[in-house]
UniProtKB/Swiss-Prot annotation:
Gene: oma-2
Phenotype on disruption: No visible phenotype. Double knockout with oma-1 results in sterility due to an oocyte maturation defect. The oocyte maturation defect is due to a meiotic defect in oocytes in which the maturation process is initiated, but there is no progression beyond the prophase stage of meiosis and therefore the cell division process is not completed. Animals also have a larger number of oocytes which are larger in size, but the oocytes cannot be fertilized and accumulate within the gonad.
The name this protein goes by in its record: CCCH-type zinc finger protein oma-2
Organism field: Caenorhabditis elegans
Zinc finger (C3H1-type): 105-133, 147-175
UniProt GO cellular component terms: centrosome; cytoplasm; cytosol; P granule; ribonucleoprotein complex
Amino acid sequence: MDMLKENVIQNNEARTESSVEPSHPDMMETVPEEQQKPISHIDDLLSETANLMAVKEQLLKEIAENEHIHSMQMRALQNLPQEAILPLQYHADPRRRHRMQKPESYKTVICQAWLESKTCAFAENCRFAHGEEELRPSLIEARQNNKYRTKLCDKYTTTGLCPYGKRCLFIHPDNGPNAYIRADKLFEVSQRHALADLRDQMEHHIMNGGRSTAGPQQFDMFARPCTPDEPAANMPLGPTPVSIRGPRYELPSKKPLETEEAGNRPPSSWPLDPSTFFALDSLNMATRPISPFESMLIGAAGNMQYSMLGKQSTPGGVSGYSSSGSTPSQDSDSSPLTAASAAADAACQANSESAQSILLKSINNPMIGNETTLPIPGLDQLAMDIAKHLELW
């Protein structure tokens, strides 16, 4: 440092001596004052250079220490198991930390997509609740918010749906029996959920090959849909906020004899199953009023049980009938009334298991068992006419 300073001073003196020649006696007095200014400037530069060099040495020491610490950390991580390394990497990445699910809000709010149509693209991986069964208690008190109940809820007032329900921080005007859905939207949403349940039931039925995997089951397709005339307050609420259903009807349970017969034929194709058509008396439909067409058939058939003409509840609203393949050729003197009378007489004998099995055999296998009984002529056309008339009635 001293040698550098001496060299700089000598160079400056040589420059000043060569450039300044004393031509006047007064100039000799001003030269020493002008030479003092570059010398002081050089001193400042030298001090700054010394400071920078000291800072550089300090930084080099810190870098060496950091490298040593980093090497020690890497050695320690190599000795840790893989299960302990993954959480550390997850928290070290700020992008992953931003995408972390907040545990305090998991499953504390109803899923908006599920609330609208009971369908969600995330399915079981959704972080929101699909129904009140999955809803968890919130760890945050709503009243701690300064905006609690100070303005109207935008979702509830505009769309009619709010996934927060009673936990919403805002006001739900005209709150009906359901805190999640506005009263005028309740029927529309219930129909969407009913269609979703029906789709799930049909998919389950198709996956099982048309066979029931358990005992008697209740199907949503028999559920009575709520009508707009019913007040929203009287609609029954299920376990989920929009599970609105009416009374359900069950299929008649098969008797042991019918179970044996089912093994000798293809799987049931409900509602075209003959057993469901001729076992309508088990649905207890005797309280329904008689249509004019049915009264005409009753008068022509004589002592015919009314349960034979009971209307079966089907998803389409059309009475079920049996389609047993091609109908045998009718006699020249046979008529629809004669066929109805024969069908009624056969149905009256269904109280005994033996008579009912004979009737089912004659319908399912019209070409077999001619010694026992003959197939009823015109049964398909008669059943179709009855179904159309009952649907119009």
